[in-house]
Amino acid sequence: MPEVKPSDIQTFASIKVVGVGGAGGSAVNRMKDAGLSGVHFIAMNTDAQALHNSKADIKIHLGHSTTGGLGAGADPHVGEAAANESRDEIKDALQGADMVFVTIGAGGGTGSGAGYVVAEVARELGILVVGVATKPFSFEGEKRRQNADWAISQLRRHVDTLITIPNDRLLQTIDRRTPLLETFKIADDVLRQGVQGISELITEHGLINLDFADVKAIMSNAGSALMGIGRASGDNRASQAAQQAIESPLIEVSIDGAKGVLFNVTGGYDMSMSEIQEAAEIITSAVSPDANIIFGATLKPELEDELIITVIATGFDSAYFQETETEEVEATNTPLNDRMTEEVVSHVDMNLDHTESAAIFNEESTENMWSQPAEQEEDESDTPAFLRRRKKRNKKTEE
């Protein structure tokens, strides 16, 4: 039997990350900057200038004849036509992959129109496809929201799993004085975290290993999914990180309806088995008793006194998802939020090109931003959100 040297060991699953359009391309650049290893990066865009500035390993100019390299003009149908024109190039770039991430910022032209075409080609090749899409801010206007709704509905039909990230919820996690361009930069970075949180479960060597087969078992034909990341340090870091992961303000619906859960605990040399067990108990208690649960533990020596927990929840039935989303929309559509949106819209030029916002601001870490627990009502501060939602749903059933 031949000897396998450490330098010869590589990830056997081929993972490709495709950034489609401006926001998707920015997410790819951030992943490259973050040193995400074991994956191949592809940027696809109708905008030739944006592609020129991309750090991706492979760059594909979509629809040369359709757009002339000048972009899709915020029209998803132009993005769709451009992707169909370049279908053979897309297919060649995706060949050989076991898993493909399609990342888009829904609402624009290229990402919204071309994203689902890329996913469709990948599925035709028998590849496991995960879509990660951000929803636009309310202040970006009704037209962009309609574009996003159409894009997400199309993407959902052509992926195994779809993770949607609502940009409006970023407003719960950042300072109100944060400049507009920096807010878009933060939104782009959420895409990076969505992809990195899943891919590292496969590419990073673990103390308790997860592999591609584990991820595929949870994410194949899974439909809508939730992702949460929690970070904590100190005496109660395991419970705090687990709670943050399942109650992140970026999670649109409760985790308790999940039929499949994949989570990973990452820590330094001081991480203990009892901490892994503590985190596992919190996460498993939040989901269906019949849920298929797979977990791993990864050692990162550079993490001193800190635990990071990544949770991927899938297998929600559509009725549950729609019901809970309706509750969330009603909770966020307050007169105050409506008034704030009107004020912002009146001062915003929505012809803004924010794809290069990363170059304008410092590359400070925003990782902790997504792991803060959602604000609770004062009289229910000790009751986790998922338990309140479960109690509410059970009450409706009894009635």
Task: Annotate the PLM regions.
Residues 1-399:
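Tubulin/FtsZ superfamily GTPase core signature
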